[in-house]
Regions:
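RNase H-like nuclease fold core
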Residues: 1-32, 36-44
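A conserved active-site cap/scaffold subdomain adjacent to cofactor or substrate pockets
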Residues: 64-88
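Catalytic phosphate/nucleotide-handling subdomain of diverse soluble enzymes
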Residues: 177-199
Length: 208
């Protein structure tokens, strides 16, 4: 299946309504961070929300100076989960084989991580960085479990995050698009160029 990149602009809004309108006919796996706008898809039978371990790691990573002991414990669970992915990559496993490996190795790790989050939360201040990190991560564990059973699902959505970075940098440099139509046009152009990069088209075109 070709990888396509799609940028969407809707009057500068990131509201839940924008996500619902955009994805009202979508069916399948929807991988995202913990942004509350996606909660609307939690109970849709034709959509499975998948979590992003990189976002969970980012929140726990931010606690290293405040509470190094707990932060390192949490990061160890996360690193072990990523190590399973590295193992699957090295073995060049099929989707089915990757899912089987995840269920055998990553499943127990995810269970242990969930238990650690549950047991650690009462030991920290809710308003502390660690308290907020755990409050972010714990509700997302059920969403993370979906990747255990389908090798096509990534453990995180870093590919989407990496595709977004050039757009963010461009936005900082340009400051403004000028008007809404210009912003919509920018989204179309970025979608086209981003998809070409995903398909390695621009590299071939440049070589020719």
């Amino acid at each position: 299946v070709p990888r396509l990149l799609f940028f969407h602009y809707d009057n500068g809004s990131r509201s839940q309504k924008v996500a619902i309108d955009l994805l009202k006919t979508f069916k399948g796996y929807l991988q995202c961070d913990g942004y509350s706008a996606y909660d609307a898809f939690e109970n849709r039978k034709d959509v499975r929300l998948c979590g992003c371990l990189a976002h969970i790691r980012r929140h726990i990573e931010s606690c290293r100076e405040e509470n190094r002991e707990y932060a390192m414990q949490g990061l160890k669970f996360i690193q072990d989960l990523y190590n399973v992915e590295y193992m699957a990559d090295e073995r060049q496993l099929s989707y089915e084989e990757r899912a089987a490996l995840r269920q055998r190795l990553a499943g127990p790790l995810l269970d242990a991580f969930e238990l650690w989050l549950q047991n650690t939360y009462p030991k920290v201040l809710k308003r502390s960085l660690m308290g907020k990190a755990i409050a972010y991560a714990y509700p997302l564990i059920p969403r993370m479990r979906h990747y255990l059973y389908d090798g096509r699902i990534f453990i995180d959505n870093n590919r989407a995050e990496n595709a977004l970075r050039p757009m963010v940098l461009t936005r900082k440099n340009m400051l403004f698009c000028g008007n809404r139509q210009a912003a919509e046009n920018t989204a179309v152009i970025c979608s086209l160029l981003g998809s070409c990069n995903c398909l390695l088209y621009t590299s071939d075109a440049a070589d020719e």
